[in-house]
Amino acid sequence: MPTINQLVRQGREVEVTKSKSPAMQNCPQRRGVCTRVYTTTPKKPNSALRKVAKVRLTNGFEVISYIGGEGHNLQEHSVVLVRGGRVKDLPGVRYHIVRGSLDLQGVKDRKQSRSKYGSKRPKKA
């Protein structure tokens, strides 16, 4: 516990919190162009081929983003919307691509959690 004299001399230092998604620059989403679309493997206990894309954002940052859902139509030069949110088993992947927005289509035949995957409501039979 500091004395009042010590506080007058030094003062309290405010803790600066580091952003988990610095490339967003406090924006909820950012537009970007895919520079490379590829698959990568997750960390130790898991095994899969995760779909990711390297995206050049409008603010000049180049980030690796995860493409969620089953199947996608992304290619190089596709324009996508990027949001924050990391993928725990992929090191360096701190962003997600928004499904059903700009050039990326929603997941086909998705019945549940449709809003997260940009799928339209299925037609009644």
Swiss-Prot record:
<keyword id="KW-0699">rRNA-binding</keyword>
<comment type="function">
    <text>With S4 and S5 plays an important role in translational accuracy.</text>
</comment>
<dbReference type="GO" id="GO:0019843">
    <property type="term" value="F:rRNA binding"/>
</dbReference>
<dbReference type="GO" id="GO:0006412">
    <property type="term" value="P:translation"/>
</dbReference>
<dbReference type="GO" id="GO:0015935">
    <property type="term" value="C:small ribosomal subunit"/>
</dbReference>
<dbReference type="GO" id="GO:0000049">
    <property type="term" value="F:tRNA binding"/>
</dbReference>
<comment type="similarity">
    <text>Belongs to the universal ribosomal protein uS12 family.</text>
</comment>
<comment type="subunit">
    <text>Part of the 30S ribosomal subunit. Contacts proteins S8 and S17. May interact with IF1 in the 30S initiation complex.</text>
</comment>
<dbReference type="InterPro" id="IPR005679">
    <property type="entry name" value="Ribosomal_uS12_bac"/>
</dbReference>
<keyword id="KW-0687">Ribonucleoprotein</keyword>
<keyword id="KW-0488">Methylation</keyword>
<keyword id="KW-0820">tRNA-binding</keyword>
<dbReference type="InterPro" id="IPR006032">
    <property type="entry name" value="Ribosomal_uS12"/>
</dbReference>
<comment type="function">
    <text>Interacts with and stabilizes bases of the 16S rRNA that are involved in tRNA selection in the A site and with the mRNA backbone. Located at the interface of the 30S and 50S subunits, it traverses the body of the 30S subunit contacting proteins on the other side and probably holding the rRNA structure together. The combined cluster of proteins S8, S12 and S17 appears to hold together the shoulder and platform of the 30S subunit.</text>
</comment>
<feature type="compositionally biased region" description="Basic residues">
    <location>
        <begin position="113"/>
        <end position="125"/>
    </location>
</feature>
<dbReference type="InterPro" id="IPR012340">
    <property type="entry name" value="NA-bd_OB-fold"/>
</dbReference>
<dbReference type="GO" id="GO:0003735">
    <property type="term" value="F:structural constituent of ribosome"/>
</dbReference>
<feature type="modified residue" description="3-methylthioaspartic acid">
    <location>
        <position position="89"/>
    </location>
</feature>
<keyword id="KW-0694">RNA-binding</keyword>
<feature type="region of interest" description="Disordered">
    <location>
        <begin position="104"/>
        <end position="125"/>
    </location>
</feature>
<keyword id="KW-0689">Ribosomal protein</keyword>
<protein>
    <recommendedName>
        <fullName>Small ribosomal subunit protein uS12</fullName>
    </recommendedName>
</protein>
<dbReference type="Pfam" id="PF00164">
    <property type="entry name" value="Ribosom_S12_S23"/>
</dbReference>
